[in-house]
Regions:
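Sec-dependent signal peptide recognition
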Residues: 2-9
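N-terminal signal peptide c-region/cleavage motif recognized by signal peptidases
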Residues: 15-17
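ATP/NTP phosphate-donor binding region
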Residues: 20-92
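Short Gly/Thr/Asp-enriched flexible loops that form oxyanion-binding sites at enzyme active sites
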Residues: 101-119, 135-137, 268-270
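Short, acidic/small-residue loops that bind anionic groups at enzyme active sites
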Residues: 114-136, 144-150, 281-284
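Conserved anion/nucleotide-ligand pocket segment
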Residues: 143-207, 213
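Internal helical hairpin/lid segments
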Residues: 216-268
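ATP/nucleoside-binding phosphotransfer catalytic cores, i.e., glycine-rich phosphate-binding loops
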Residues: 260-319
Length: 319
């Protein structure tokens, strides 16, 4: 009995911790949010737990989360596309928030390319596989989109609470700029840098590579390129970066910012530094954006600048 009671208490405190974190964004209370699942889905408990968060007004139609034939997708391509389209065109909501990443967003882009741009711009949030949609929305529709924690992340107590708080401040207009502090210079070109300005693009490295040769291929010229990834061995990371370079996607860029890559092992950092030293543009590193505990919001397709802040640097993104 004692062991059972202990297990029950552990489960209870774990649940309370998750919901305590989910309840943090009081700034978002009663604001309509359309939740979409353009990639992988979630189990029924996760969906139920999200719906029970009282501080958030989440619109999560059951039809959008019905499983299809492929278990790694939230639903069929048709259902996922229609639910995403409904959310993007919904006049009563200003926020479209992705359930999670995983896989599947790129499968929807051929149909998205057939749509006319909505009259109303929205906040679109997500990361990882959702990078494909960031590229589409920013390049085709000219939207500013937010690389930030997915909705399912609200239930993960291991994630930093600031991930959600900073998102809430942006969505409610409480701040005029999003800031990433303590960027480190990775090459000698970056060290004397006083100012780099340009719009941000990029996201998950695997998805950026997937865009090459498609109608939604990433456009990097004149921009600051942000890249992050997970489950990539150092040699795979090196190969991916070489592919970007040989594809001509690093020509005429303003700078590169690397986010996290699998806890940034010594060999991973060696790969990044070695690659950076072969480039003639400033390259920076941050541990505040990616698949780790901290995932601060990054705003794509907005006027941004990297400025010197002593020995470190700061990324400032206008809203």
């Amino acid at each position: 009995m004692k062991l059972k009671n202990l297990i029950s208490l552990i489960l209870l405190f774990s649940s309370l911790s998750a919901f305590s974190q989910a309840a943090i964004p009081q700034l978002l209370k009663n604001i309509p949010i359309n939740v979409v699942a353009p990639a992988s889905g979630a189990d029924s408990k996760t969906l139920s737990d999200l719906k029970s968060i009282k501080t958030l007004n989440l619109n999560m139609p059951a039809k959008c989360f019905s499983k299809g034939d492929l278990p790694f997708l939230a639903s069929t391509d048709e259902i996922r596309f229609n639910c995403l389209k409904d959310a993007l065109y919904n006049e009563s909501s200003n926020i479209v928030w992705s359930l999670r990443g995983g896989y599947g967003s790129a499968r929807l882009i051929p149909d998205l390319l057939k749509l006319s741009k909505p009259n109303k711009k929205k906040f679109f949030i997500g990361y990882s596989d959702i990078t494909a949609l960031h590229l589409f929305l920013s390049q085709e529709w000219g939207w500013k989109t937010i690389h930030g924690t997915n909705v399912a992340g609200l239930l993960k107590p291991e994630q930093d609470q600031g991930n959600v708080i900073k998102l809430a401040e942006i969505l409610q207009g409480k701040v005029k700029q999003a800031v990433i502090n303590n960027l480190a210079a990775l090459n000698n070109v970056a060290k004397p840098t006083e100012l780099v300005s340009g719009k941000l693009t990029g996201g998950n490295l695997t998805m950026v590579l997937s865009s090459i040769g498609t109608r939604w291929q990433i456009k990097t010229a004149g921009k600051i390129l942000f890249l992050e990834d997970i489950n990539v061995a150092p040699y795979q990371l090196d190969r991916a970066l070489i592919q970007l370079k040989q594809a001509g996607l690093l020509e005429n860029i303003k700078a590169i910012i690397f986010g996290t890559f699998d806890k940034d092992s010594k060999l991973t950092m060696l790969v990044l530094r070695n690659f950076a030293n072969d480039l003639k543009v400033p390259v920076f590193k941050t541990d505040r954006c990616g698949h780790e505990k901290i995932n601060d919001p990054i705003i794509y397709n907005t006027d941004s600048k990297i400025i010197s802040n002593g020995e470190k640097f700061k990324l400032i993104m206008d809203l």
